[in-house]
């Protein structure tokens, strides 16, 4: 596996490749990331991964400086997955001058849910993903359903900007107790880690309520929020949305069997966790 930081060297290395499968990450790789590499291999060859902790998608009071950086461990894991190239640019490589041009998603998708609580987050994501796509020029790219809203925004962005990249969705990988794998799980104390699976259990309860015939979605959401708060969480949202566009479903959508998803974000101690479950 070649480890490359220069954009020009990356382009030289990939010249002539027209079936590249790309997996962008921020590093601190876990089994969820590695499952993305394996899925990428099913859809293209060679597989290219990137590791870049993107300052543009962190808010002023978020964990950019604390975000775990484990490049050497990550390299060893990617070598075992037979990744062809790891693109690991420095901040100077990606942003040699102030990034004045930004890619901003539409407000109806980028300013809800995560976008409401993390202003500018999806503009940072879209900007860096567009730039990475321009560098790698993949045929397919793999994104996890764990970041459901991000997946939808990136997919729509590629469609609307006519980027010739097929976005492949990967299922969320979970620990045996149900907790979705995340690089931020390492922030959890032992007691918090024992409590953390309750987030996925709460989503499962929401799904059961909807599938069981309850139609007052606001009441279901409020019940879930209260349940988490009573256990010491600080939830930002528990929200049932249409999978197609993340708009809140009407009664007609529910009766018609519209595919839904419930999404949540909540703080446990100092650690903010997100998760979702399709209904």
Curated annotation (Swiss-Prot):
An example Gene Ontology molecular-function term: ATP binding
Subcellular location: Cytoplasm
Residues the record lists as binding (R)-pantoate: 57, 150
One Pfam family named in its UniProt record: Pantoate_ligase
Binding site for beta-alanine: 57
Cited Gene3D superfamilies: HUPs, Pantoate-beta-alanine ligase, C-terminal domain
EC numbers for this chain: 6.3.2.1
Entry protein name: Pantothenate synthetase
Organism: Burkholderia mallei (strain ATCC 23344)
Gene from which this protein is expressed: panC
């Amino acid at each position: 596996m070649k480890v490359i930081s220069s954009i020009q060297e990356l382009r030289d290395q990939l010249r002539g490749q027209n079936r590249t499968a790309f997996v962008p990450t921020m590093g601190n790789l876990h089994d969820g990331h590695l499952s993305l590499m394996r899925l990428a291999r099913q859809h293209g060859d060679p597989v290219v991964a990137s590791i870049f902790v993107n300052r543009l998608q962190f808010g002023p009071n978020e964990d950019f400086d604390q975000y775990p950086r484990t490049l050497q461990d990550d390299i060893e894991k990617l070598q075992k997955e037979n990744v062809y190239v790891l693109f690991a640019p420095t901040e100077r490589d990606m942003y040699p001058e102030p990034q004045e041009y930004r890619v901003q998603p539409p407000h109806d998708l980028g300013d809800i849910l995560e976008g409401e609580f993390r202003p500018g987050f999806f503009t940072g994501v879209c900007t860096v993903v567009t730039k990475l796509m321009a560098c790698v020029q993949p045929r397919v790219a793999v994104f996890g359903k764990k970041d459901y809203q991000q997946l939808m925004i990136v997919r729509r962005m590629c469609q609307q900007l006519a980027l010739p990249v097929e976005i492949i969705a990967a299922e969320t990988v979970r620990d045996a107790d149900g907790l979705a794998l995340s690089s931020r799980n390492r922030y959890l104390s032992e007691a918090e880690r024992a409590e953390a699976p309750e987030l996925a259990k709460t989503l499962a309860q929401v799904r059961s309520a909807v599938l069981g015939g309850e139609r007052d979605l606001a009441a279901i959401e409020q019940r879930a929020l209260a349940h988490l708060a009573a256990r010491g969480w600080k939830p930002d949202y528990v929200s049932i949305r249409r999978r197609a566009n993340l708009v809140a479903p009407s009664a007609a959508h529910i009766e018609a069997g519209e595919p839904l998803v419930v999404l949540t974000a909540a703080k446990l101690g100092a650690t903010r966790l997100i998760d979702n479950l399709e209904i």
